[in-house]
């Protein structure tokens, strides 16, 4: 945690003072924990998109006076799980425009584009950062390099989410919980994904083809979805940090590439 806190502190020092900072990252990568450590000696107000009363408070800020009251006396305002708040993009813009000297932070366990074009709504007001699971160098901070190399096959299989690293015996259950949380809380609820059986079939097909070339049309034929629908689903999965797409290797880019 110390190394991550030190890295984020260095990033904050280079961040423009007139930007709200959005920390993206998959669920359980330590976004909230990191900010708690970073601002433990500051006056911070925490709000969460998972809490109905917090969502109601944020969506009811109808004037600059309301925003001034909310930010009064604060060093930092943190909005956790911001993608669940309706109109979060415009809200962040208004908060940033109205703040006196308060730092504005938002965290999102899926790309905030899922909430309706946040980056477009708050163009010029946001400074995005992405927090990934633990890196090899971070693991080596707390273990010997020999231990890290011996655990490499496991890391390549189940990943390096902090919960999985600290409780390896629960890795399968943790991954299942994270996947279901992302699918049912973010993709189905926020992005409006329907035809859940076909969607889950698509996810299984993608998992079975890791490292292999895939075409949207072929995947669509196998799971009963149209090619444009498959393309949208894959894009949403990537925004939610479930998959990572890699374009085909090409030496010569042309207009047809």
Where are these regions (language model features)?
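Interdomain motor-coupling "hinge/lid" segment immediately C-terminal to the ATP-binding subdomain
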Residues: 109-111, 116-208, 212
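Pre-Walker A adenine-sensing motif
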Residues: 3-14
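Conserved small/polar residues in nucleotide/adenosyl-binding loops
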Residues: 1-5, 253-257
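Conserved lysine of the Walker
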Residues: 31
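Hydrophobic positions on the alpha1 helix immediately C-terminal to the Walker A/P-loop
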Residues: 34
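Structural recognition of the conserved hydrophobic beta-strand(s) that form the central parallel beta-sheet
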Residues: 103-109
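Short glycine-rich substrate-engagement loop in P-loop NTPases that contacts/grips substrate
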Residues: 46-72
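Accessory nucleic acid-recognition modules appended to NTPase machines
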Residues: 176-255
């Amino acid at each position: 945690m110390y190394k991550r806190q030190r890295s984020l502190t260095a990033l904050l020092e280079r961040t423009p003072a007139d930007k709200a900072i959005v920390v993206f990252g998959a669920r359980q990568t330590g976004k909230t924990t990191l900010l708690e450590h970073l601002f433990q000696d500051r006056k911070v107000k925490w709000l969460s998109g998972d809490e109905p009363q917090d969502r109601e408070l944020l969506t009811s800020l109808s004037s600059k006076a309301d925003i001034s009251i909310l930010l009064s006396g604060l060093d930092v305002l943190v909005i956790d799980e911001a993608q669940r708040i309706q109109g979060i993009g415009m809200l962040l813009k208004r908060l940033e425009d109205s703040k006196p000297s308060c730092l504005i932070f938002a965290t999102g366990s899926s790309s905030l584009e899922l909430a309706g074009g946040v980056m477009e709504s708050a163009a010029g007001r946001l400074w995005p950062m992405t927090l990934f699971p633990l890196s090899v160098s971070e693991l080596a901070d707390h273990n010997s390099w020999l231990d890290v190399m011996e655990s490499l096959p496991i890391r390549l299989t189940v990943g390096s989410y902090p919960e999985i690293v600290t409780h390896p015996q629960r890795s399968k259950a943790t991954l299942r919980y994270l996947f279901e949380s992302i699918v049912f809380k973010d993709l189905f609820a926020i992005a409006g994904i329907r035809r859940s059986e076909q969607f889950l079939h698509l996810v299984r097909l993608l998992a079975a083809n890791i490292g292999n070339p895939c075409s949207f049309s072929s995947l669509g034929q196998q799971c009963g979805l149209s090619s444009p629908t498959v393309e949208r689903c894959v894009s949403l999965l990537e925004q939610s940090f479930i998959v990572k797409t890699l374009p085909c290797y090409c030496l010569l880019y042309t207009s047809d590439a």
